[in-house]
A protein has these predicted regions:
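Active-site helix of classical SDR
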Residues: 108, 141, 149
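Alpha-helical segment proximal to the catalytic Tyr-Lys
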Residues: 113, 154-158, 215
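Canonical Rossmann dinucleotide-binding motif of NAD(H)/NADP(H)-dependent dehydrogenases/reductases
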Residues: 1-24
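Active-site loop-to-helix junction immediately N-terminal to the catalytic Tyr of the SDR YXXXK motif
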Residues: 88, 127, 132-140, 151, ...
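Substrate-binding pocket helix/loop in short-chain dehydrogenase/reductase
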Residues: 84-85, 92-94, 187
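Short C-terminal tail/terminal secondary-structure segment
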Residues: 207, 218-235
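A conserved structural motif in NAD(P)-dependent oxidoreductases
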Residues: 191-202, 213
Length: 235
């Protein structure tokens, strides 16, 4: 699980460990990853922390060699920042694609080459890929990740490796808590459910895709967004 030391990633690590998996928590923050891994280990869960810069392809492939074979890959790590449409730069686009798409593609390629037939890959996209204001580089990178999900699902289906994506909406993470009260209220007003989701909601969806009961589902996007994708203006 990449980006596994906080937020949705941490909830996913704990959920998969409770499902019986031995989980590699991959994160760039050594102190945080080691602290959270120790906390989960104290609960009797099989979790190991691994520090990795996902933009370092050689390091990515070295870690995959160390961990292989991997039964389930969760590409959760990503970056988000706001840029107005008329000021977003080519550097902003490159950085978003480097982390939100290319890192996931590199890891998927490396893992799938050694993954047992019947493995599972889950990509964490975003409801924003449908279109949203004030972060066009992020929207584009997540839309690209959805496209890559479908392409890799077709490539890997003959081996029984299933690839799906989850598109979270408003989830209670540090990014959401950083919003001003007015901005948060405006966002929640657009939610049919009137509330934000929890990281555990995403972890539950990952657990579903990682399970043996999903043997005929691949190339799909599951929206976990409190109904936001049903309509309304993007934010």
């Amino acid at each position: 699980v990449t980006g596994g030391a906080s937020g949705m990633g941490l909830a996913t690590v704990e959920r998969l460990a409770r499902d019986g998996f031995s989980v590699a928590m991959v994160d760039r923050d050594r102190a945080l990853a080691e602290r959270e891994a120790q906390r989960l280990q104290a609960m009797g869960l099989a979790v190991q922390a691994h520090v990795l810069d996902l933009t370092d392809e050689a390091a990515v492939r070295a870690l995959v060699d160390q961990l292989s074979p991997v039964q389930v890959l969760v590409n959760n790590a990503g970056i988000f920042d706001e840029r107005k449409f008329d000021v977003v730069s080519s550097a902003d686009f490159r950085r978003a694609y480097e982390v939100n798409l290319i890192a996931a593609a590199t890891l998927t390629q490396a893992v799938s080459q050694q993954m047992p037939d019947g493995g599972r890959i889950v990509n964490i996209a975003s409801r924003a890929y449908l279109g949203a204001r004030n972060h066009p580089h992020y929207v584009a990178s997540k839309a690209a990740l959805v496209g890559y999900t479908r392409a890799s699902a077709m490539e890997l289906a003959p081996r029984g490796i299933l690839v799906n994506a989850i598109a979270p909406g408003l989830i209670d993470t540090p990014i959401l808590r950083a919003l001003t009260p007015e901005r948060l209220a405006a966002q929640l007003a657009l939610q049919p459910t009137g509330k934000a989701g929890q990281p555990e909601d995403i972890a539950q969806a990952v657990s579903f895709f990682a399970s043996a009961q999903t043997g005929f589902i691949t190339g799909q996007v599951l929206f976990v967004d409190g109904g936001k994708s049903l309509g309304g203006s993007g934010a």
